Structures are given as C-alpha cells and as structure tokens.
Amino acid sequence: MAKILVLYYSMYGHIETMAHAVADGANRVDGVEVVVKRVPETMQAEAFAKAGGKTQNAPVATPQELAEYDAIIFGTPTRFGNMSGQMRTFLDQTGGLWASGALYGKIASVFSSTGTGGGQEQTITSTWTTLAHHGMIIVPIGYGAQELFDISQVRGGTPYGATTIAGGDGSRQPSEEELAIARYQGEHVAKLAVKVHG
C-alpha cells in the first residue's frame, strides 16, 4: 500500500479546493492510502481574519511526519513567483529529514494558484529546488491531461503541475477544467507511487 500525502497551504480556499481534487484523483488508484493535511498558519489570527482568510478543517501536518509517506503532493499559492511563506516556513523545518535522508527517493509533485496567472510555473519549479535537495523524485504532469490543450477560456494548468487562477480579488473559484487537471495530477502521482513503492 503506497501512502500519499496531499500537503497544502491555502489562505482563501482555492488551493484547499484543488488539494481535495488532487486527493480525489489519487483515490482512483488501487493500492493507495491518501491523506490531506495543511501546513500551520503563521499569521496572527486577527490579521488572518482581517485579510479574509478562510477557516479550514484539514488537520495540520508536522515536518517529521513527511517521512511516513511514499509520495507527497505539495499545494501552495503563488507569492511573487514563489511558494507562500507558510509553506516555506514548514519546509525550512525539514533539515533533520534532509540530514537523515528520510525523504530520499520519495515521489514529489507540486500544484499552485495565482491571482492573474503570473508566476504559477515559477512557483512550481522554485518549489522543486527544495524537493531536489531532499533527493525526492519530482513528477510533473506533462500534457497527459487533455484539458491542457483547451484554449477556449482562461484557465490554469501547466505541464509542471495543476494550477488555478483566482483573479485579482480572489473571486474566481477553480473551474471544472482546472479541477480535472488537479485530479489527473493526483491519479498520475498515485500510479507512479504504486509502481515505485507499492
């Protein structure tokens, strides 16, 4: 049984929605156990609420537990072409895992969101840098999801990983096409996890 963690940070709920779609896709594959968790919030509660942050019910992960999984699919919003500070803070606490090689050979993949589309690919590839230092097997999605070929509407989605475009004010929710790409990413990673670790 391959254990898969979908680990995310989401302030306004877009990445949370994508995380559940990724998990749904992974659950399509036999021989996997899928867990969805989030990284801790680093903002003060009052500031988070004032900024319009959305309360989320997913349990909070600890850096140490990452070693328990065969594959980890990371979800983070874009902050100026980089992962969110909350995800960065979480990953910066994995030095002990790096020193022991605990994540070496585990599968990793990344999905993201942006306000207007700028930086979504950079966020994914810059996150890969941290994962590469851990020796993780980085899995992009290529053009395996047919939705990536549809140019009839504004949407996220890249060969690097699933993305969504939230709009400058955050009012746009993930589209069905974006969620389909996220489900594809989860299924793709799960199939590989079963082959490698199952």
From Swiss-Prot:
Cofactor, free-text remark: Binds 1 FMN per monomer.
Q: Where does FMN bind?
A: 10-15, 78-80, 113-118, 133
Domain Flavodoxin-like: where?
4-189
Query: Might you give the EC number(s) for this enzyme?
Result: 1.6.5.2
Listed Pfam families: FMN_red (PF03358)
Q: Domain of life of the organism in this record?
A: Bacteria
Q: Mind naming one GO cellular-component term on file for this protein?
A: membrane
Q: Which UniProt keywords apply?
A: Flavoprotein, FMN, NAD, NADP, Nucleotide-binding, Oxidoreductase
The UniProt record gives the binding positions of substrate as 98
Query: HAMAP family annotated for this entry?
Result: NQOR
Name the record gives this protein: NAD(P)H dehydrogenase (quinone)
Q: Which organism is it from?
A: Klebsiella pneumoniae (strain 342)
